[in-house]
């Protein structure tokens, strides 16, 4: 079927009240064509009251060529009804193009899938245009292409039209660079509802719009079904690009309900909005997870443009609209261009509700002003779940900006990150104006590279009901009458703040910390502090606190390292807490605390004195004023202090009534003075010092005598026959002093060769380990050593034994004091031993004998230098040792050559001095000498047993008495084979 025309070309036409039924069971093609300057072209034209029914799927084609100036209609109805099955509709050419056009009432019904192609108009292109009509579709596909004309729109429903799409909808709209507007869906005083998914792709024109909903004379409604997904992509509007735009011109309501998951992706070179709403009668609802992105692209660097994921703006009555997200949502605004304003969420008197478990907002801009959230003129934002905001920009950047009576309530955990190329203009959270309130009801993490973490002005308020972590060094500031910031107001939150805090010109700042992991590091002015349960304030400059309550907490004035920090308190209360103060008692200078009013209670004073660094000892009478309490109510007591360096320091504090000043006058009851210092090494330092004791003790206790090494060599060996030997032995035991307990295990293997019947020369290697336990630490030593020796036997049962020994210690040290530490150290050791002895038979028949012995061991335990994990530099000087031994062995030997014996030795260390120097990471120093010189006795029991003609077993057990370092017990057991 085909209709051609030079004026009005029509393929199918029904007059007023006419009816026509067409049955195309096998399908049909209906064409309307014009090829000259006719007025209008119609494939189907229905007059008022007419009724057209078409059975079967059809192709409906309407083509205008040759520069026709009339409109081109695929289906035209001026009040008639039409019902179709499936349809492929193509409308091409003409002035204005309409795929489906309806006016003045009437209904379109499509029982099967419909695809509409409308393209190449000189003016407008509409896939579906309805004014007062109803239309029902199944699945609908529209392609509206107007590359040369002015406007293009997929569906335009107005004037009480109702459109229902039972299946899925796909709309593609394109307008050329010279065109005006491109829209996928436009609703004005009408309703469109979709049961399935929506995919809309829009590009080009001055203004590109995914969905535009307007109400003027009647309500306007758009809704999607619960199945599928809404996916809207809009790009390249030269003046503006919008994913969803809603506007109410009067009191008539605009409603947009997205009942399925939604993605709105918008990009353009000028103004770019994912969602934009105008007017208080607008309402937008997202029931499933949503992603809204706005991208300002390169190509237009106008500094007047705006990029926003969501923007709700007020109308002439100063009322904004409402948007609600029932599940998770991610808002992204990126300005590659030089946008003047970039925002994730912009509310101007509107209301935004986020009811999902997660709300994410990301803003990245090359432009001037960037906002994660900007809430103005009485706007309201409620976030029920977690909130994550990341805002980055070039100049003014705000994580949250709240102004002019607006309110934000965040119930979940919040994480806010702000970065600006101009750090002076980066604000994490900002609230200004009376009744401008922000409430964080759960824990908050705040990160900014700028100066301001939180700032309120002119009556603005920010409440952190729980914890706040802000460790970027930015300040927290309440300025102006009725401005207020509360931190951890409900208690129990983790508070970690690095940065100064201020309350000035009528502003108040209430800061609470109530657990041992909470801290503040910064200066303060005019704040109210409540500190409990091990929390710490590390003061970094002169400060004053309007109120300070300390309950088992600490204020540390030493952090700034100045040594003269001033700290003023108007109202002080507390007990069981500490002030930690820098002092130089020798110079009588230090930090100062000034209290106006105080409640009764005891506060402890700990000091970090300069003598810890310069090594001076204060011996003269000194009076250093530390505290002035004008109320004379509080009590202050000195308490020992470990600053994490080398020393524990205990100060003596005295009230001024008990102090005579250097000018001879008596002090006053208001004042408290530091008068004395007592210092001792702290528990962690003791471990470092005592670790050297363990090395020395292990080296000394593994020293040799001939009997220990080779047994009764000169008695069981046939001195008339040359013989070589190989041997091995085990040495183990325990040792200790009043400061430590140690144990060790050593294994030794040796070989010797006979130069003649009375002389042997050999070498040995040994490997072992020791473990040392200290009161507040432990040490593990690994020792690898080697030795060479020579033994000479005389004709009168005497012997001379010379041993040269050398070894290396590898030591692991751990401390478990107030500041646990660990280190690795390495040192070398050397010794030369000369021993002489003679066996004297007492009764040959009984086999009894005695053996006087004398020995000298000269050696050196080398120095070691190391740095602990906490930055303490340790130099452990070497030890020059000279040990002399006089001893006697008394025993009994049987006929086979086996023997048992008792031995007694007296030993003396003639050397044993070493120097120790330490420099802590915090500057504290220590220098001392250690002296291992001592006299002690050893008592032992041993024996030798022949295993055969060329082998024997030997061993002994011994212990020492009388020395500071004692050998609690030691076992020595070996076996030797000769060949």
Predicted feature descriptions by range:
Residues 490, 514, 719-720, 752-754, ...:
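Structural signature of outer-membrane beta-barrel channels/translocons
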Residues 787, 875-979:
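Outer membrane beta-barrel transmembrane domains
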Residues 1-7, 20-40, 51-71, 81-96, ...:
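Beta-strand-rich solenoid/repeat architectures in extracellular/passenger domains
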Residues 458, 593, 599, 741-747, ...:
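Residues that define the transmembrane beta-barrel architecture of outer-membrane proteins
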Residues 435, 448, 464-466, 471-473, ...:
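Extracellular beta-solenoid/beta-roll
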Residues 615-633, 742-758, 873-881:
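Short secondary-structure subsegments characteristic of cysteine-rich extracellular domains
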Residues 690, 695, 771, 775-777, ...:
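Solvent-exposed, glycine/polar-rich loop segments of beta-barrel outer-membrane systems
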């Amino acid at each position: 079927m085909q209709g051609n025309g030079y004026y009005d070309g029509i393929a199918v036409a029904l007059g007023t009240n006419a009816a026509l039924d067409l049955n195309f069971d096998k399908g049909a093609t209906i064409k309307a064509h014009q090829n000259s300057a006719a007025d209008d072209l119609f494939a189907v034209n229905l007059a008022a009251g007419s009724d057209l029914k078409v059975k079967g799927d059809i192709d409906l084609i309407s083509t205008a060529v040759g520069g026709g100036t009339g409109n081109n209609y695929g289906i035209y109805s001026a009040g008639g009804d039409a019902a179709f099955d499936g349809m492929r509709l193509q409308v091409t050419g003409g002035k204005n193009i309409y795929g489906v056009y309806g006016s003045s009432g009437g209904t379109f019904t499509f029982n099967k899938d419909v695809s509409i192609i409308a393209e190449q108009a000189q003016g407008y292109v509409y896939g579906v245009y309805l004014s007062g009509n109803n239309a029902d579709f199944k699945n609908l596909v529209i392609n509206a292409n107007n590359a040369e004309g002015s406007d293009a729109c997929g569906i335009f429903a107005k004037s009480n039209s109702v459109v229902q799409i039972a299946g899925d909808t796909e709309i593609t709209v394109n307008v050329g660079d010279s065109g005006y507007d491109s829209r996928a869906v436009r609703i004005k005083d009408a309703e469109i509802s979709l049961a399935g998914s929506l995919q809309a792709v829009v590009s080009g024109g001055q203004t590109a719009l995914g969905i535009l909903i307007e109400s003027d004379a009647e309500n306007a409604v758009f809704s999607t079904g619960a199945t599928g997904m809404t996916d809207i992509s809009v790009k390249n509007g030269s003046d503006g690009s919008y994913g969803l735009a809603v506007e109410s011109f009067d009191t008539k309501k605009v409603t947009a309900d997205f009942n399925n998951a939604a993605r709105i992706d918008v990009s353009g070179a000028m103004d770019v909005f994912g969602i934009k709403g105008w007017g208080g009668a607008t309402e937008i609802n997202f029931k499933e997870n949503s992603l809204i992105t706005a991208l300002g692209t390169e190509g237009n660097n106008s500094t007047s443009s705006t990029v926003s994921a969501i923007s709700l703006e007020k109308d002439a009555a100063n009322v904004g609209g409402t948007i609600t997200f029932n599940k998770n949502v991610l808002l992204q605004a990126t300005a590659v261009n030089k946008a003047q304003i970039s925002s994730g969420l912009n509310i101007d008197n509107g209301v935004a509700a986020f009811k999902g478990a997660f709300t994410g907002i990301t803003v990245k801009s090359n432009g001037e002003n960037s906002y994660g959230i900007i809430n103005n003129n009485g706007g309201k934002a409620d976030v029920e779940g977690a909130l994550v905001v990341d805002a980055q920009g070039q100049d003014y950047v705000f994580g949250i900006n709240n102004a002019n009576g607006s309110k934000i309530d965040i119930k979940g955990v919040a994480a806010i990150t702000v970065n600006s190329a101009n750090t002076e203009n980066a604000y994490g959270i900002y609230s200004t104006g009376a009744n401008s309130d922000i409430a964080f009801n759960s824990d908050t993490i705040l990160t900014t590279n700028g100066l301001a973490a939180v700032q309120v002005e002119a009556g603005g308020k920010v409440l952190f009901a729980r914890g706040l972590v802000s460790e970027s060094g930015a300040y927290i500031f309440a300025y102006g009458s009725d401005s207020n910031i509360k931190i951890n107001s409900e208690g129990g939150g983790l508070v970690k703040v690095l940065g100064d805090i201020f309350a000035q010109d009528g502003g108040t700042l209430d800061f609470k910390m109530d657990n041992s992991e909470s801290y503040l590091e910064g200066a303060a002015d005019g704040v109210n502090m409540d500190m409990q349960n091990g929390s710490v304030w590390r003061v970094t400059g002169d400060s004053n606190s309007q109120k300070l309550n300390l309950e088992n907490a600490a204020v540390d004035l030493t952090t700034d390292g100045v040594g003269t920090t001033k700290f003023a308190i108007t109202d002080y209360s507390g007990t069981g807490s500490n002030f930690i103060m820098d002092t130089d008692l020798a110079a009588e200078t230090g930090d100062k605390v000034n209290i106006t009013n105080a409640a009764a209670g005891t506060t402890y004073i700990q000091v970090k004195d300069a003598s810890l660094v310069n090594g001076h000892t204060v011996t003269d009478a000194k009076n250093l004023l530390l505290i002035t309490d004008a109320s004379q109510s509080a009590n202050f007591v000195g308490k020992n202090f470990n600053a994490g360096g080398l020393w524990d320091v205990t100060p003596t504090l005295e009230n001024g009534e008990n102090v005579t000043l250097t000018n001879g006058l008596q002090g006053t009851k208001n004042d408290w003075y530091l008068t004395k210092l007592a210092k001792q090494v702290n528990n962690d330092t003791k471990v470092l010092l005592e670790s050297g004791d363990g090395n020395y003790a292990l080296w000394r206790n593994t020293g040799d005598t001939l009997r220990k090494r080779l047994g009764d060599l000169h008695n069981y060996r046939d001195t008339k026959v040359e013989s070589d030997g190989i041997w091995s032995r085990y040495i183990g035991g325990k040792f200790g002093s009043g400061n430590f307990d140690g144990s060790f295990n050593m294994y030794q293997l040796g070989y010797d060769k006979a130069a003649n019947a009375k002389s042997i020369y050999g070498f040995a290697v040994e490997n072992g380990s020791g473990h040392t336990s200290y009161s507040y630490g432990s040490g593990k030593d690994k020792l690898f050593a080697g030795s060479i020796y020579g033994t000479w036997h005389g004709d009168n049962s005497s012997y001379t034994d010379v041993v040269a020994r050398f070894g290396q210690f590898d030591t692991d040290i751990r401390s478990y004091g107030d500041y646990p530490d660990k280190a690795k150290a390495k040192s070398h050791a050397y010794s030369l031993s000369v021993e002489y002895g003679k066996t004297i038979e007492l009764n040959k028949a009984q086999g009894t004998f005695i053996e006087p012995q004398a020995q000298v061991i000269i050696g050196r335990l080398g120095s070691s230098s190391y740095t602990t994990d906490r930055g303490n530099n340790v130099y452990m000087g070497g030890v020059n040792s000279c040990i002399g031994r006089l001893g006697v062995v008394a025993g009994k030997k049987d006929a086979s050559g086996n023997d048992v014996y008792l031995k007694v030795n007296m030993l003396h260390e003639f050397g044993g001095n070493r120097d120790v120097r330490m420099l802590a990471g915090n500057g504290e120093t220590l220098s001392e000498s250690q002296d291992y010189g001592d006299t002690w006795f050893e008592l032992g029991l041993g024996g030798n047993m022949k295993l055969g003609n060329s082998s024997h077993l030997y061993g002994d057990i011994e212990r020492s008495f009388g020395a500071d370092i004692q050998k609690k017990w030691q076992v020595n057991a070996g076996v030797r084979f000769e060949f």
